[in-house]
Amino acid sequence: MELDVFAGQEKSELSMIEVARAILETRGRDKEMYFNDLVNEIQNYLEKSDADIRSSLPFFYSDLNTDGSFIPLGDNKWGLRSWYAIDEIDEEVITLEDIDENAPKRKNKKVNAFMDGDEDAIDYNDDDPEDENFTPSSAILEYDNDNEDDENAEVESYDSELNEIIPDDDLDDVELSEEDDDDDDDYEDETND
């Protein structure tokens, strides 16, 4: 078998993936090949031994999967992606309709690197089962139900505690007067300069 694409090139310099592409292109559209047949054709063209092909087979298969120009067609058949229109390619597509909105959502499990598989250790990052039922509406505190008498009692007890620290009689004796402060004058002098 001769491939016109590689005329004038040494076969030892060609990669298996290049030869596979050329073989499939010469066969034409809708002439996909089984993987084993493709490898045999490549081996015959490159004139490589069985041992050489076996050693490079994993790399070739990886290249075949990652190269964007090849497409697996099922049953270990391979073809060129250019042979098929986008509409013909049967790939799994997840749409919003496929997602069940009522399905229970799974929580991501946090991994604690410091636990070391100790089953007796307490994982404080574990969620409390009561937290799962927590809703913001249950957290709203109602202040309207407070008793005004309780509030007045609190204010009176606070006032009595303050009176213990400073009696009301002493507050009347304190005179507030404005002192002359030299620092204020110094500040005014600095700002006027």
UniProtKB/Swiss-Prot annotation:
Start-end of Acidic residues biased regions: 119-133, 143-193
Annotated Pfam families: HARE-HTH
Disulphide bridges, residue numbers: none
Organism domain of life: Bacteria
Transmembrane segments: none
Sample GO molecular function, one term: DNA-directed RNA polymerase activity
GO annotation terms (biological process): DNA-templated transcription; regulation of DNA-templated transcription
InterPro entries tied to this protein: Asxl_HARE-HTH (IPR007759), RNAP_delta_N_dom_sf (IPR038087), RpoE (IPR029757)
Record has Nucleotidyltransferase as a keyword: yes
Chain segments carrying region Disordered: 119-193
Start and end residues of each HTH HARE-type domain: 14-83
The entry's keywords: DNA-directed RNA polymerase, Nucleotidyltransferase, Transcription, Transferase
Any one cellular-component term (Gene Ontology): DNA-directed RNA polymerase complex
Function summary: Participates in both the initiation and recycling phases of transcription. In the presence of the delta subunit, RNAP displays an increased specificity of transcription, a decreased affinity for nucleic acids, and an increased efficiency of RNA synthesis because of enhanced recycling.
Subunit relationships: RNAP is composed of a core of 2 alpha, a beta and a beta' subunits. The core is associated with a delta subunit and one of several sigma factors.
Similarity remark: Belongs to the RpoE family.
Protein name: Probable DNA-directed RNA polymerase subunit delta
Annotated source species: Streptococcus thermophilus (strain ATCC BAA-250 / LMG 18311)
